[in-house]
A protein has these predicted regions:
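N-terminal nucleic-acid engagement/recognition segments and initiation subdomains in replication
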Residues: 8-228
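Structured core elements
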Residues: 199, 287, 335-337
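Short, flexible loop/turn elements at secondary-structure junctions
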Residues: 204, 290-292, 340-342, 365
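P-loop NTPase catalytic core of nucleic-acid-dependent motor ATPases
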Residues: 217-318
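Conserved Walker
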Residues: 276-278, 347-350, 367-371
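AAA+/P-loop NTPase substrate/partner-engagement loops
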Residues: 302-354
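Conserved catalytic/switch belt of AAA+ P-loop NTPases
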Residues: 353-371
Length: 371
């Protein structure tokens, strides 16, 4: 295949041999000298055995070492050496290899929320011990100063220490961040109308296709790269149709009858609330009422299980207005269940507990408060 694509020319062969030598280098210093001989750079970072080093060539020390070697050869004590051997020996005597991190942090992509204008750099952190690489985010402030970078690195990866300078960090990231990939983000789970995509934890649905998140925690959909920042809501989704139990509609009817199917229709309809509002301007509420022990909780928990979530809802009277708003904005095209709305009252009609002003929900009807 490489031959057919014209990738086996002499210059290509030299590059492959160089890459192989880097891979097989026994020590960090051997690897550093290979890179210097190839690139001619006198300062650079390099990784070896999942540790990070900084290579520096002292040109004055190199010139002095070379002169001493040549003088030793001409005066007799030093055996004859070729120019290449003299150069290599002088390099060994004039280079400094400084360990700057006991791990290897790599910038993978830049993620940005266009609505909130928040942005982060997403990094992979490899360590020299067994185990998968860890991943996490750094802010712009944390990648511009060594002290802040060191704190965040240690926060994300246990025992990971960066001991280099701010200048070394800047030069290292200058190469890593050049033309870095950009990933768009949303801060909720569910349907993104702007991208016409459902983001459901480890899976996404776009144009009728089910997609799985890649190893770097985002979805690639054509030219679009996107991810959800909402991690607190977990959906356990089974994508294997062969293992799915298809007898549940019968059990739902036997347990709850037509009322169960009405709730089911509303529940499934919530998956398309944004699309319905785009056509009809609104999507209705559903109120499930009944005597104690009639199965309201069982029905709601069952419907949630259809969406892969072990959940019932939240009690708005036990939350602040800001807390309720956070709950409403965590999802899009997924149900929001408010439970225990009816309260016993004391004589005179006053409630035992603080009540909720249900007028708060008026603008949720047309999607202005909740998606």
């Amino acid at each position: 295949d490489l031959h057919q694509r014209g990738k086996l020319e002499e210059k290509d062969r030299e590059e492959y041999l160089y890459q192989g030598a880097l891979l097989l280098a026994e020590s960090a210093k051997d690897k550093a000298l290979l890179i210097y001989n190839k690139t001619g750079r006198t300062e650079f970072e390099l990784e070896h055995s999942n540790r990070l080093y900084w290579f520096t060539l002292d040109l004055a020390a190199y010139s002095k070492a070379k002169d001493q070697i040549e003088k030793g050869i001409s005066d007799g004590p030093t055996p004859y050496m070729t120019e290449t051997e003299i150069r290599d020996k002088a390099l060994e005597a004039s280079t400094v290899l400084q360990p700057i991190a006991n791990c290897v942090p790599k910038a993978l992509y830049y993620q940005r929320n266009e609505i909130t204008q928040e942005a982060w750099y997403y990094f992979s952190i490899s360590n020299p011990h067994d185990g998968p690489a860890l991943q996490g985010t750094f802010t712009a402030g944390q990648v511009t100063t060594a002290s802040e970078f060191k704190k965040q690195l240690l926060h994300l990866a246990p025992g990971a220490i960066y001991s280099g300078s701010s200048g070394q960090l800047e030069r290292m990231l200058l190469r890593q961040l050049d033309n870095i990939k950009v990933v768009q983000t949303v801060d909720y789970i569910g349907y993104s109308a702007a991208h016409k995509t459902y983001l459901l934890g480890n899976y996404a649905v776009h144009g009728g296709q089910v997609l799985e998140a890649n190893s770097e925690d985002y979805f690639e959909i054509g030219k679009l790269s996107i991810k959800s920042l909402q991690k607190s809501i977990k959906l356990q989704i089974n994508t294997d149709r062969e293992t799915q139990d298809k007898t549940w509609p019968v059990h739902l009817w036997n347990a709850f009858g037509p009322q169960g199917y009405v709730a089911l229709a509303y529940w499934i309809g919530s998956l398309f609330a944004e699309q319905i509002r785009a056509e009809q301007m609104s999507f209705p509420f559903l109120e499930i009422v009944g005597e104690p022990g009639s199965g309201k909780t069982t029905l709601i928990q069952f419907l949630w299980k259809l969406f892969g979530r072990d959940y019932e809802g939240f009690d708005p009277s036990k939350s602040t207005a800001a807390g309720r708003m956070r709950t409403f904005t965590q999802v899009s095209n997924l149900p929001i269940v408010l439970i225990e709305s009816d309260r016993e009252t004391k004589t005179g009609g006053s409630s035992h507990v603080k009540s909720v002003d249900w007028d708060e929900l008026r603008d949720a009807y047309n999607g202005r408060k909740a998606r």
